[in-house]
Amino acid sequence: MAKKPGSQNTSGRGQRDLKVKVKTARGRKLSSTRWLQRQLNDPYVKRARSEGYRGRAAYKILELDDRFRFLVPGARVVDLGCAPGGWCQVAVKRVNALGERTSKAQGSVLGVDLQEMEPIAGATLYQLDFMADDADEQVRVWLGGKADVVMSDMAASSSGHKQTDHLRIIALCEAAAYFAFDVLEEGGTFVAKVLAGGAEGELQKLLKQRFAKVANIKPPASRQDSSEKFVVATGFRAKA
């Protein structure tokens, strides 16, 4: 039986230091073999499997929240592009969406994605394109009001060209930011993944117009060889 997700020791340390070497099977590309070997030896992958999370990305949002404390009991959270669901699992626990901590306020977690997902206890999941014309209005209806947190771990499909992928994810992040402007409560928080590459300036400028503070963070759970980082914008101003 999988353990309940927890916030302790998010570093991935404490796992047995056993390295797995994968042989290249006939018909399998060398790059696929390397990816599989990295997955099998990744301490965060091992922790996610043992603690019941749907992916190692859960530890990224755990580490970001440990620092910025935006997933508080009672918060209403929207997770854009939420598949496979690791971020939703973390949010459910931290905002007390199941009401397990009776002395704390009970929050809610709403996840949207283009693909259908397996249910997550404590989260409400919808198959929705957040860039559709009426998506923001629909989300507010489902929430019964505005959100305290909008978060996104989305990434566009990889093209294999670093700069193209960078531009695509910046465009996706900007779309998520405009969505957040429409659904966030005053003082709310926006969290999103970006890839470093030189085109972040306009995104930073946009966010600084609407948030009191904007930080760029590479949490420990992000792989060191990745250009991935996260923007955490706090103190949303409903009026620019």
Swiss-Prot record:
Which reaction is catalysed here?
uridine(2552) in 23S rRNA + S-adenosyl-L-methionine = 2'-O-methyluridine(2552) in 23S rRNA + S-adenosyl-L-homocysteine + H(+)
Main EC class the enzyme belongs to? transferase
Q: Name one Pfam family in it.
A: FtsJ
> Catalytic center at which residues?
K193
InterPro entries on file: RNA_methyltr_RlmE, RNA_MeTrfase_FtsJ_dom, rRNA-MeTfrase_E, SAM-dependent_MTases_sf
Record's subcellular location? Cytoplasm
Task: Give this protein's Gene Ontology molecular function annotations.
Answer: rRNA (uridine-2'-O-)-methyltransferase activity
**Keywords linked to the UniProt accession:** Cytoplasm, Methyltransferase, rRNA processing, S-adenosyl-L-methionine, Transferase
The record's region (Disordered) falls at: 1-20
Indicate whether Methyltransferase appears among the record's keywords: yes
For S-adenosyl-L-methionine, which residues are the binding ones?
G85, W87, D113, D129, D153
Q: What is its main location?
A: cytoplasm
Give the EC number: 2.1.1.166
List, as start-end ranges, the regions of compositional bias called Polar residues: 1-13
What GO cellular-component annotations does this UniProt entry give?
Answer: cytoplasm
Q: Which SUPFAM superfamilies match?
A: S-adenosyl-L-methionine-dependent methyltransferases (SSF53335)
Instruction: Identify the Gene3D superfamilies for this entry.
Output: Vaccinia Virus protein VP39 (3.40.50.150)
Statement: the UniProt record of this protein carries the keyword S-adenosyl-L-methionine: yes
Q: What does this protein do?
A: Specifically methylates the uridine in position 2552 of 23S rRNA at the 2'-O position of the ribose in the fully assembled 50S ribosomal subunit.
By its UniProt entry, which PANTHER family does this protein fall under?
RIBOSOMAL RNA METHYLTRANSFERASE, RRNA METHYLTRANSFERASE 2, MITOCHONDRIAL
Q: Which family does it belong to?
A: Belongs to the class I-like SAM-binding methyltransferase superfamily. RNA methyltransferase RlmE family.
* Name of the featured protein: Ribosomal RNA large subunit methyltransferase E
Source species, please? Roseobacter denitrificans (strain ATCC 33942 / OCh 114)
Q: What is the lineage of its organism?
A: Bacteria, Pseudomonadati, Pseudomonadota, Alphaproteobacteria, Rhodobacterales
